[in-house]
Amino acid sequence: MSRTIFCTFLKKEAEGQDFQLYPGEIGKRIYNEISKEAWSQWVTKQTMLINEKKLSMMNVEDRKLLEQEMVNFLFEGQDVHIEGYTPPSQ
């Protein structure tokens, strides 16, 4: 059974996460405020960041950078800037 939340990223009612995807207070906030659709958008940006910046999830500094980018993207409305990437025209 899916749960419905008000997604603060999409600014509308949407299907919520099935379980907490991220640890700690940020994880609780994601679970309560970020929909599956918004999380999917973040995962796409995260993958691009990891690949383009050659981040290693074994490196603590890289994980901190990724976490900050995630908070900026999901909660502060800042898009992820990836050097050299031009989004396809709509």
UniProtKB/Swiss-Prot annotation:
NCBIfam families: PRK05408.1. Coiled coil: none annotated. Belongs to the Fe(2+)-trafficking protein family. Could be a mediator in iron transactions between iron acquisition and iron-requiring processes, such as synthesis and/or repair of Fe-S clusters in biosynthetic enzymes. Keywords: Iron. Pfam families: Iron_traffic. This is Probable Fe(2+)-trafficking protein. The keyword Transmembrane helix does not apply. SUPFAM superfamilies: YggX-like (SSF111148). Monomer. It comes from the Bacteria. InterPro entries: Fe_traffick_prot_YggX, Fe_traffick_prot_YggX_sf. One of its GO terms (cellular component) is cytosol.
